[in-house]
Amino acid sequence: MSASGYKAGYISIVGRPNVGKSTLLNHLIKQKISITSRKAQTTRHRIHGILTDVQSQFIFVDTPGFQMRHRSQLNQVMNRVVLQSMQDVDVILFVLEAGRFGREDEQVLEQLPRNLPVILVINKIDLLPDKLQLLPFMQKMADLFDFADIVPVSALQNRQLSDLTEVIRHYLPENPPVFTEDEITDRSERFLAAELLREKVFRQIGEEVPYSVSVIIEQFAVEGNLRRIHACILVERENQKAIIIGKQGKKLKDMATQARKDMEVLFDGKVYLEIWVKVKSGWADDAIALKSMGYE
């Protein structure tokens, strides 16, 4: 690709938990690389998703949901990731849920830089009970911050995402591409395997357990078209271990099957997956343990 007139830049996606940031990223790049669930704090790491076309390269930075309710070391690390992600980028997407602007959204708004183009993305417009509420909500938000642009979308239904892409393109600087055309993320297959398994835990288990769960890939071997993966699901208490395993191991088996299928689609090959569940008390408040697990 010629660098002449070509645009490339980093776009940080920020917002409170559960506004649909990861779903937005996955649909923008047309590939699932960031895990999703209805539970807060599903995303824990900064993940780059890359969309490349003949005119531009969009390097999206998905981030954890910013929130101040929990004070664990893990939550502090995730909030720090969000704040760092708003530095050294070219554009920021501030994602809100249509018709909803609460204290947690306000806390994110207070962190937004004034020296960068910030695009307000109003997501989940399909869930707005009265569509006439949208324009007043957009005006309300425009009065609170000098947004470069405001774009209403439905990430889940792929509505107006092409419009959003064109708005972002306008604000990207002229640069040669950073990544090759076929790269869709900066994360390794090992990392993505851990995330896909953690997603299944979040989706299958009740409200409390997921926040005490982490996934560690202990072995990742590539043998031709086969990937052999040994994974450990880490929890904080014995009763959580029992919940994840389930009666006669059924829950764990179901999670393993679903994760393996997703991995085979993403990696375009066969996957042999073995999973263990281990207890490590207090890991979410252990700075050394968090660092060893790859938390920034």
Curated annotation (Swiss-Prot):
Q: What is any Pfam family matched here? A: KH_2
Stretches the record annotates as G1: 15-22
- In this chain the KH type-2 domain maps to 205-281
Region G2, annotated ranges: 41-45
User: Which residues of this UniProt protein bind GTP?
Assistant: 15-22, 62-66, 123-126
- Which parts of the sequence are annotated with region: G4? 123-126
G5, as annotated region? 153-155
Q: What is its main location?
A: cytoplasm
Q: How does it assemble?
A: Monomer.
What PANTHER family is this protein classified in?
GTPASE ERA, GTPASE ERA, MITOCHONDRIAL
What does it do? Answer: An essential GTPase that binds both GDP and GTP, with rapid nucleotide exchange. Plays a role in 16S rRNA processing and 30S ribosomal subunit biogenesis and possibly also in cell cycle regulation and energy metabolism.
Family label: Belongs to the TRAFAC class TrmE-Era-EngA-EngB-Septin-like GTPase superfamily. Era GTPase family.
Q: Identify this protein by name.
A: GTPase Era
